[in-house]
Amino acid sequence: MSKLVVFLFCIQVCFIQNVYSQCLGRVGPGGPPLGPYGGPLGGPGYGPVGYGGCGGYGGSGIGNVAVAGELPVAGSTGVTGQVPVIGAVEFAGPACAVGSVSISGACGPTCGCGGSPFY
């Protein structure tokens, strides 16, 4: 086999791993049921069992979105269930709006305002 074919094959394998790691989350190289039952890595210095999760990149990050212009918005929105949102929204400039907003519930357990704080 030529070196180019081997190189392209390796690139394809990396692409496939990247795509499917988004769906599997933090599943380790041995799969979810096999992680706790594996042997220790590199001797007893790593504990009695192997590591359970060494999954691919989860796809989270920080980004900015800028929108300029007129934004005519009309209608109503109803959200029922759990909506995990952590972040901030900032408006700069005049924003003519009419309506009401009602937010009820509690934030996640990590912030400490809705549940017990997580340490």
Curated annotation (Swiss-Prot):
Residues 1-21 form the signal peptide. Transmembrane segments: none annotated. Pfam families: Chorion_1 (PF01723). Keywords: Repeat, Signal. InterPro entries: Chorion (IPR002635). GO terms for biological process: chorion-containing eggshell formation. Residues 22-55 are annotated as: Left arm. Residues 56-103 are annotated as: Central domain. The keyword Repeat applies. Residues 104-119 are annotated as: Right arm. One of its GO terms (molecular function) is structural constituent of egg chorion. This protein is one of many from the eggshell of the silk moth. Belongs to the chorion protein family. This is Chorion class CA protein ERA.2. It comes from Bombyx mori (Silk moth). The gene is ERA.2.
